[in-house]
């Protein structure tokens, strides 16, 4: 599509509580939110990281051994990309007529991956990527994405849609490669992250993670949607975090929408509020921002600094 005209696109960022470790209820809630966004005129919609079946914060405060039963349940309630459950979600996206980036814990054979599926308004999965490096203790439970997951932007009827998961936003080269793919609207899929406190380092706070994503809007001259989860007080015990002072419930949400100069486009919701944030955006505003800052164009020095990217995905099995 042409980005030069006055066409307005409505974007939608989810902030909601998952149906913890319950695949079927998680699919049902996902469908409800998609239909709601469609009825409210959304064109592009983003969901949090591992929205289905929710982010397991217990992996940060309990040992792998202590989490065996919990994570077994988590595995069984993770979503397969090629499944009846995904087909139901795809049908809802088609009914709503939107472009959706769905974050979920992907179950593939015997492994889990932190994944995003890009679903167009026809209900087709036009791209699928996995977090290339799960963060810290996450590596005990989720596998890594390969070179095909470096592609993070796809063309759509509503502009070029990109997406990254959580601390992938700290991967400077990965961000840069997304800018080089000419992203217009970026879906920043985050889990629930709580406010700054003495128990955790500041870089694992909603304040810092929000700032990091805001910088991506400015740096990439793109519209950015922070999509995050929340946790209610009654679900703390269910998630094995009821005795952890770092967890403030209800809370964990920090969803937001930013413009291509890094400006906030909506009022930030309360950290414990379930809401879909909406903003009407004009993609042509990107070019105004690019006049000043185009880090993959006029404000770059490829003769001095450049990025090397592989596009050959590694495989466990090779045929002679």
Curated annotation (Swiss-Prot):
Keywords: Hydrolase. The active site is at residues 49, 131, 166. The keyword Glycoprotein does not apply. It is an enzyme of class 3 (hydrolase). It catalyses: a nitrile + 2 H2O = a carboxylate + NH4(+). GO terms for molecular function: hydro-lyase activity; nitrilase activity. Residues 9-283 form the CN hydrolase domain. Its EC number is 3.5.5.1. It comes from the Eukaryota. The keyword Phosphoprotein does not apply. Gene3D superfamilies: Carbon-nitrogen hydrolase. Pfam families: CN_hydrolase. Belongs to the carbon-nitrogen hydrolase superfamily. Nitrilase family. Nitrilase that hydrolyzes preferentially benzonitrile and 4-cyanopyridine. Also acts on dinitriles like phenylenediacetonitriles (PDAs) 1,2-PDA, 1,3-PDA, and 1,4-PDA, and cyanophenyl acetonitriles (CPAs) 2-CPA and 4-CPA, but with lower activities. This is Aromatic nitrilase. It comes from Aspergillus kawachii (strain NBRC 4308). The lineage of its organism: Eukaryota, Fungi, Dikarya, Ascomycota, Pezizomycotina. The gene is nit1.
């Amino acid at each position: 599509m042409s980005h030069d005209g006055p066409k307005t696109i409505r974007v939608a960022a989810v902030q909601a509580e998952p149906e913890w470790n319950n695949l079927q209820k998680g699919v049902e809630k996902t469908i409800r939110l998609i239909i709601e966004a469609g009825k409210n005129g959304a064109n592009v919609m983003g969901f949090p990281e591992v929205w289905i079946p929710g982010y397991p914060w217990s992996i940060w405060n309990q040992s792998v051994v202590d989490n065996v039963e919990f994570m077994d349940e988590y595995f069984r309630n993770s979503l397969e990309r090629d499944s009846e459950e995904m087909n139901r979600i795809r049908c809802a996206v088609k009914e709503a007529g939107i472009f959706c980036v769905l974050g979920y814990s992907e179950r593939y054979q015997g492994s889990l991956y932190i994944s995003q599926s890009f679903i167009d308004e026809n209900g087709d999965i036009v791209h699928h990527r996995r977090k290339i490096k799960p963060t810290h203790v996450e590596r005990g439970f989720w596998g890594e994405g390969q070179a095909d997951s470096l592609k993070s932007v796809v063309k759509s009827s509503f502009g070029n849609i990109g997406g990254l998961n959580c601390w992938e936003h700290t991967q400077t080269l990965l961000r840069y490669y997304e800018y080089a793919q000419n992203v217009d609207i970026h879906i920043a899929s985050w889990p629930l992250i709580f406010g700054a406190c003495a128990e955790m380092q500041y870089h694992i706070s909603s304040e810092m993670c929000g700032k990091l994503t805001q910088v991506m809007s400015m740096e990439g001259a793109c519209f950015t949607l922070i999509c995050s989860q929340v946790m209610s007080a009654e679900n703390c015990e269910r998630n094995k975090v009821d005795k952890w002072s770092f967890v403030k419930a209800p809370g964990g949400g920090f969803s937001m929408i930013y413009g291509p100069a890094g400006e906030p486009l909506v009022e930030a919701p309360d950290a414990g509020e379930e809401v879909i944030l909406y903003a009407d955006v004009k993609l042509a505003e990107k070019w105004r921002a690019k006049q000043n800052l185009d880090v993959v164009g006029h404000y770059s020095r490829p003769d001095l600094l450049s990025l090397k990217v592989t596009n050959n995905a590694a495989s466990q099995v090779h045929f002679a």
